[in-house]
């Protein structure tokens, strides 16, 4: 189940065309729990399973530049990040990207510090949004795009009831491979007036973005097809 979830949501990371992917992982209940009344595993069980999967994934594939981290667990789901350390390091090696992320409160001294900052950002957002009575990350259920992408789609209006709803940390889009110019424009335009909408909202180069989205769709489709016919995660990593 976990491996299929990784392929479905992080195929482009495995293939090396995307620095990171953010997604929800929902472990199945064990067989001995099949007759109980609970709908899903408790957070402690989810945290334990997610941590085991992330640890094993990282142990196996970190030498090939890919790792997995658990960012947070709530309501029976784990928010997980599969990333390429070298690509994240390259991102923060770009002066404009580093300045943007640093201004947003990220530690840009290295990939691990960057992931740690992301964990703090996402946890803080979730806590504030939950306190405001809004939807939590546990309600993101779009398997075609990652969690941060889903938050940018127009079909997902803000459900917060506060006069000043907590702002989603849209700067995370840069870590997921979205162009910095589009992330900046998305923030400046309050998520409106885009020229094209797909994995992210494109403001600067819609045709280039569409080509990129198509390449991502093809990568994901091919990876899933290979996985279903017996390919291992190791074989899918570029």
Give each language-model segment a name.
Residues 38, 117-164:
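Intrinsically disordered, low-complexity terminal tails and inter-domain linkers enriched
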Residues 199-238:
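Long, compositionally biased
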Residues 1-35:
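Short, extreme N-terminal leader segments that mark the start of a protein/domain
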Residues 10-15, 67-73, 118-127, 162-163:
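Short, flexible, solvent-exposed loop/turn segments with mixed acidic/basic and small polar residues
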Residues 111-126, 160-169, 194, 201-217:
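C-terminal alpha-helical interaction appendages
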Residues 18-20, 75-78, 169-171:
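Short, surface-exposed beta-edge/turn micro-motifs
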Residues 166-196:
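Hydrophobic/aromatic-rich, well-ordered segments within soluble, folded domains that form packed cores
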Residues 36-112:
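A glycine-rich, hydrophobic loop/mini-helix early in the fold
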